[in-house]
């Protein structure tokens, strides 16, 4: 069974919410911070409480490495400890690293994030140097069932600068990327009909959503953009297949939910936000 199979089953069991642990130190409630500990240690305490509170309603977690790199060595220890904390509760974890290099460098990235202190179940990758920026990760998919989510049509406004450009044959650049990755992924299919090579498909741009889902039916989607970036449940539902086939990420919306729920502890507020998000997406899917 591949990690993508396990993610599919996690979504079946708990829903498609992907909790983004993009944890900036400034997000921590002032009364939670222990002044005797480092920023990294406080972030790990925060993350662990949030993981424990949301693990029953989270399909997976996504840990954005930049928030940890910015703190230097203590941050990288916090990153490793956070990945470990997620893996210990048995929920799939995505390392949001967006690597995009080639050859030996990519081999080292793959080794660094699929083994050792920073081991994760999935990584995010940038494809624009070509398929040789993806291939060094594939042995880990073949031998260990590891998975990857490759940027295809992203949720940021600047996506239209490159991804939406038209090719001579009428396709967009994101179509070309998706087509090539979809073809490559057919050699790495799992038991539930999804490839180990997933796609990052932003939930803020809904143009041709139904066509994208139909065209890449073998590809599991990582769908950013919900909540703080403006993505709505009724739009995002179009990228799912009967409520599965993708995970929907929310980071700030969950991490900072306590600010919209006065008097509620941050971990309880995060749980409430996950439940609300899960129910909203399920309702939207039921209307399709």
Locate each region found by the language model.
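Glycine-enriched alpha-helix->loop->beta-strand junction motifs that scaffold or abut catalytic
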Residues: 13, 58, 115-121, 142-148, ...
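Conserved, mostly hydrophobic/aromatic
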Residues: 19, 61, 96, 123, ...
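Active-site-adjacent beta->alpha loops and helix N-cap segments on the catalytic face
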Residues: 70-85, 102-107, 129-142, 204-213, ...
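Conserved anion-binding
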Residues: 97, 101-198
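A C-terminal functional module that forms or caps the active site or interfaces directly
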Residues: 199, 203-249, 253-257
């Amino acid at each position: 069974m591949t990690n993508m199979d396990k993610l599919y089953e996690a979504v079946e069991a708990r829903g498609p919410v992907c909790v983004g642990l993009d944890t900036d130190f400034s997000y921590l409630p002032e009364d939670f911070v222990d002044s005797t500990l480092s920023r990294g240690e406080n972030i790990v305490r925060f993350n662990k409480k949030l993981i424990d509170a949301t693990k029953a309603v989270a399909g997976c977690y996504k840990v954005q490495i930049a928030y940890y790199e910015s703190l230097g060595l203590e941050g990288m220890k916090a990153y490793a400890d956070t990945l470990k904390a997620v893996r210990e509760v048995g929920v799939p974890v995505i390392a949001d690293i967006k690597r995009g290099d080639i050859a030996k460098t990519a081999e080292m990235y793959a080794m660094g994030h699929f083994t050792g202190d920073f081991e994760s179940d999935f990584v995010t990758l940038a494809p624009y140097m070509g398929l040789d920026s993806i291939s060094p990760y594939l042995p880990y998919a073949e031998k260990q069932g590891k998975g990857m989510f490759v940027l295809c049509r992203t949720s940021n406004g600047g996506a239209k600068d490159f991804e939406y450009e038209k090719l001579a044959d009428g396709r967009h650049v994101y179509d070309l990327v998706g087509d090539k990755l979809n073809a490559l992924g057919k050699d790495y299919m799992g038991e539930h009909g999804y490839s180990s090579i997933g796609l990052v498909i932003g939930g803020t741009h809904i143009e041709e959503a139904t066509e994208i889902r139909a065209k890449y039916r073998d590809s599991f989607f990582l769908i950013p953009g919900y909540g703080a970036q403006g993505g709505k449940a009724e739009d995002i539902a179009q990228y799912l297949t009967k409520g599965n086939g993708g995970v929907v990420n929310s980071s700030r919306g969950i991490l900072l939910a306590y600010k919209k729920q006065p008097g509620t502890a941050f971990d309880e507020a995060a749980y409430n936000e996950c439940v609300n998000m899960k129910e909203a997406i399920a309702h939207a899917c039921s209307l399709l």
